[in-house]
Amino acid sequence: METAAGARYSTAPSHRGWSVPGTPVLVRYADDLVALCYSREHAEQVKERLAAWLAPRGLTFNEDKTRIVHLSEGFDFLGFNVRHYRSTGKLLIKPSKAAVKRFRARLRAEVRSLYGSNALAVISRLNPILRGWAAYYRTVVSKQVFAQIDHTLVWTMLKWGRHRHETKSYRWIMNRYFGRFHPARQDRWLFGDRDTGACLTRLSWTPIRRHQMVNADASPDDPALAYYWRQRRRRRLPPDTPTAPAPAPYTLRRPQGLA
């Protein structure tokens, strides 16, 4: 596919794996594809080449989802928004507005389904969802979005408390379910269960760690690079995920009853 689109990469030792200037860069995941080009005319040429490559394989572009846009307008890809900001001259990758909207809606739906449950059940249901979403977006510019969702979730949980204790005031609910539950954090507005000490995790606790580019020509199928890929996977572990313990050494034992 890359060859058909005209993508070429440098073979020079100092720039091995870099795209040759003037050629497109393709990023593909499953059936989602982004082609980064130098102009609209260049993008249209690449689209024609790819359409010709897909046709013999019985495939076509979905014209309703295929767009040619300038990077300053930005585009969404796999839940991320990629955009070049002329005011700062920076290209930023953030959680897309659509992805954030879907996640907020999911949290509200989950909490509504738990109106009749206790605090511990709510925490047990929401924490894996929060950690998973934070792990997915922790490599991009997500700090502000994380803080905004944390703030919204406080009000969502206050509403949950109001439904669970209809005759109680908001002050009573705050005193009952909110406080400094995490011993290593100074957050005062943590939703928690006072009987067990468990608390709702916060997205903003997830440190932002930028994606580290894969070395050129590094294939996961190369046995000589097993250690390299093992180290990369270890760095990509979500927060609060323990690494797998090393396997115990094998020992030989003589079966009982045999000489």
What are these regions, as identified by a protein language model?
Residues M1-A259:
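Non-catalytic terminal/accessory segments
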